[in-house]
Amino acid sequence: MTKTDQQQIKQQLSVYFIMGTANTSRQPLDVLKEAIQGGITMFQFREKGEGALQGEEKKQLARQLQVLCQEANVPFVVNDDVQLAIDLDADGVHVGQEDTNAEDVRQKIGDKILGVSTHNLDEVKQAMKDGADYVGMGPVYPTETKKDTRSVQGVSLITEVRHHGLHIPIVGIGGIAYDNAAPVIQAGADGISIISAISQSADPKKAAEELRALVTSEKALL
């Protein structure tokens, strides 16, 4: 990845909205539309958990969400489902440590965006070796969204990775909301990933606007 590409990814990670049907009681399309109006910079379709859509239903929703992203020039990333990402010609794929092997995903998706969730320095180094364009780090804070989550580690891993001189783009993951987002950027992350702080907000547009403004102002102070 060239320096230019890396800078672009760092910008795109600023407010990284993640959502599936399990994360909102409203129509996902309406929530995403409002979040885009509020200024999210990347979107990940994560259709997991109890009652998650399967097969054609899942693909249909993904395609509709993708169209909204395309219209707004917001990168559309698929969580774990590599085949769906290929079928839709999505902008990228995000995988966790328990998902499909990152190196295999890179071979399948070519030069599309590849993100990998990481929980320690060794996993970060492995992700870089496997060809990741960015890493998600966390859980930074306690989260209700993922029931199988690892132990909370605050921003310590982000700080550690930056101290080791690793410049891979980083997005903080897990329990991040407006009132606790600033330390994530201050520690060296390029952005924050958000689920419920937008998807369960009464006003997703306003929530996204406030998060975008916060990230922008914190980055300006660095």
Swiss-Prot record:
Keywords, alphabetical: Magnesium, Metal-binding, Thiamine biosynthesis, Transferase
GO biological process assignments: thiamine biosynthetic process; thiamine diphosphate biosynthetic process
Keyword Cell inner membrane: no
Catalytic activity: 2-[(2R,5Z)-2-carboxy-4-methylthiazol-5(2H)-ylidene]ethyl phosphate + 4-amino-2-methyl-5-(diphosphooxymethyl)pyrimidine + 2 H(+) = thiamine phosphate + CO2 + diphosphate; 2-(2-carboxy-4-methylthiazol-5-yl)ethyl phosphate + 4-amino-2-methyl-5-(diphosphooxymethyl)pyrimidine + 2 H(+) = thiamine phosphate + CO2 + diphosphate; 4-methyl-5-(2-phosphooxyethyl)-thiazole + 4-amino-2-methyl-5-(diphosphooxymethyl)pyrimidine + H(+) = thiamine phosphate + diphosphate
Gene Ontology molecular-function annotations: magnesium ion binding; thiamine-phosphate diphosphorylase activity
One of the record's GO cellular component terms: cytoplasm
Entry's EC annotation: 2.5.1.3
Pathway field: Cofactor biosynthesis; thiamine diphosphate biosynthesis; thiamine phosphate from 4-amino-2-methyl-5-diphosphomethylpyrimidine and 4-methyl-5-(2-phosphoethyl)-thiazole: step 1/1
Cofactor binding, per record: Binds 1 Mg(2+) ion per subunit.
Domain of life: Bacteria
InterPro entries documented for this protein: Aldolase_TIM, ThiamineP_synth_sf, ThiamineP_synth_TenI, TMP_synthase
Keyword Transmembrane helix belongs to the record: no
Positions bound to Mg(2+): D80, D99
Xref: Pfam families: TMP-TENI
Amino-acid positions noted as binding 4-amino-2-methyl-5-(diphosphooxymethyl)pyrimidine in the UniProt annotation, renumbered to this chain: Q44, F45, R46, E47, K48, N79, S117, K146
Positions annotated to bind 2-[(2R,5Z)-2-carboxy-4-methylthiazol-5(2H)-ylidene]ethyl phosphate: T143, E144, T145, G175, I195, S196
Listed cofactors: Mg(2+)
Family stated for the protein in its record: Belongs to the thiamine-phosphate synthase family.
Function: Condenses 4-methyl-5-(beta-hydroxyethyl)thiazole monophosphate (THZ-P) and 2-methyl-4-amino-5-hydroxymethyl pyrimidine pyrophosphate (HMP-PP) to form thiamine monophosphate (TMP).
UniProt protein name: Thiamine-phosphate synthase
Source organism per UniProt: Bacillus pumilus (strain SAFR-032)
Originating gene: thiE
